[in-house]
């Protein structure tokens, strides 16, 4: 239960991320979440499911946008396993014309795009942001910097900097677990401060990625780590990272 694991922190509103509900029923999760909101007062906004390469994507987006809590859409684009593999001609990727055609419909419904992709595809995400400047892209999981080698982090920074140059981009700091290692502030401090430096505090926000990130730490360990790492920042910047930016981008009720 989210509120049990987060009870030591002042959670005032929640934003639900789609959980890859039955792809044949993308509206089902949205309906259920609205019923949950009516019963509990949570969640207060949601990122809904819609696969841009569906034949009926126009209808799916129209239906998702009718729900009061829907703010953004997530469709995880196809990706490669490493930066040395080409993405060209892969259906469902950021470069796929069918994917991009479906993506183009977000503007009509004033919906954001929550993007989960590894850093080596951020050049394609940058092009997407350029081609559709009226749609905000919120990069999930910090661009997945799991390769903590010198070269890996250097290329992650380069690609992230290029992506951040587009004014219609933002980033969520979450999902920075390293396989086989415990989440610690020492391990992740450099990553977090780099992201804030690259995007500026006005376009960054912390996210829990729970329950997935419970595989590498408790909620307290992660959020106390976030707080300790940013403790030296001005109070207004901390307020933006933990609260105001989430309000700005997701407009929770």
Q: What do the predicted segments below correspond to?
A:
Residues 89-205:
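Catalytic pocket-lining loop regions of alpha/beta-barrel enzymes
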Residues 1-37, 224:
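An N-terminally biased module of ancient metal coordination in phosphate/nucleic-acid-related enzymes
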Residues 19, 50, 77, 142, ...:
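Active-site metal-binding loops of divalent metal-dependent hydrolases
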Residues 21-24, 54, 145-148, 178-181, ...:
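Short, small-residue-enriched loops and turns at beta-alpha junctions
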Residues 1-8, 12-13, 193-194, 198-205, ...:
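Mid-to-C-terminal alpha-helical segments outside catalytic/metal-binding sites
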Residues 14, 46, 106, 141, ...:
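Conserved, mostly hydrophobic/aromatic
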Residues 24-120, 127, 172-177:
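Active-site gating/metal-coordination segments in enzymes
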Residues 26-42, 126-138, 188-199, 222-231:
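Short, electropositive alpha-helical surface patch
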């Amino acid at each position: 239960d989210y509120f049990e694991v987060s009870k030591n922190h002042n959670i005032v509103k929640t934003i639900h991320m789609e959980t890859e509900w039955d792809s044949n029923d993308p509206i089902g999760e949205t309906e259920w979440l609205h019923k949950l909101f009516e019963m509990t007062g949570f969640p207060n906004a949601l990122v809904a499911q819609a696969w841009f390469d569906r034949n009926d994507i126009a209808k799916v987006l129209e239906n998702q946008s009718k729900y009061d809590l829907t703010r953004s859409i997530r469709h995880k684009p196809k990706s490669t396993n490493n930066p040395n593999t080409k993405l060209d001609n892969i259906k469902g990727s950021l470069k796929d014309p069918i994917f991009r055609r479906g993506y183009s419909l977000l503007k009509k419904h004033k919906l954001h795009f929550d993007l989960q992709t590894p850093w080596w595809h951020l050049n394609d995400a940058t092009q997407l942001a350029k081609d559709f400047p009226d749609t905000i892209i919120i990069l999930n999981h910090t661009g997945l910097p799991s390769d903590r080698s010198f070269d890996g982090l250097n290329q992650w920074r380069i690609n992230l900097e290029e992506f951040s140059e587009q004014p219609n981009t933002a980033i969520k700091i979450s999902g920075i677990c390293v396989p086989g290692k415990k989440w610690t502030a020492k391990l992740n401090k450099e990553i977090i401060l780099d992201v804030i430096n690259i995007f500026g505090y006005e376009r960054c926000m912390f996210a829990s990625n729970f329950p997935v990130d419970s595989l590498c730490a408790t909620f307290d360990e992660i959020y106390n780590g976030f707080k300790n790492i940013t403790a030296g920042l001005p109070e207004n910047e901390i307020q933006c990272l933990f609260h105001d930016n989430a309000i700005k981008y997701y407009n929770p009720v």
